[in-house]
Amino acid sequence: AILLFASGQDVLGERFITHLVETLPDEQIIQMIHFLEEFKRPHVLVMVGKRKASQGRSFPRPYFALHPMIDENYPVPAQLSLAIARRESEFDPRVVSPVGAAGIMQIMPRTAKKMARKVGVRYDKNRMLSDWKYNARLGTVYLQELSERFGANPVLVSVAYNAGPTRAENWSRLLGD
């Protein structure tokens, strides 16, 4: 895995690790957890933790892995931005959804362009997948906009982020907030 990561073959390294942990005893899984923390692979930690949890084995550290974005200064609470990033991408900065949402915060291109204009930076499609800080900045600015729109209600903000503000408004009208 180290050689794969060092040679830029991140996807193969991640695949190797997720398959390897299927055969490891708990003590070696704990060693793998430390390795993944050292190599700053929180999204692989989440994958390992979820896979083991589905088998009835609990490794809380990887299941609740934190991302370095916790140390950044964003316009919304860290808990909200981390929860959205973990749910949307499992902290994988390279993931693209079937509908085109991209990066750690899974932002749709049109929304990302709008947020880039709002903060005065150039929209760069490539950076959406290669620079998690850029992606997180645009995503958290969008979360801030939604928080202002929905009165900082975390449920409605989360629904709006995932399904769009119109659906969140319809849901709120139908079910109350």
Where are these regions (language model features)?
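Cell-wall glycan-active module
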Residues: 1-156, 163-177
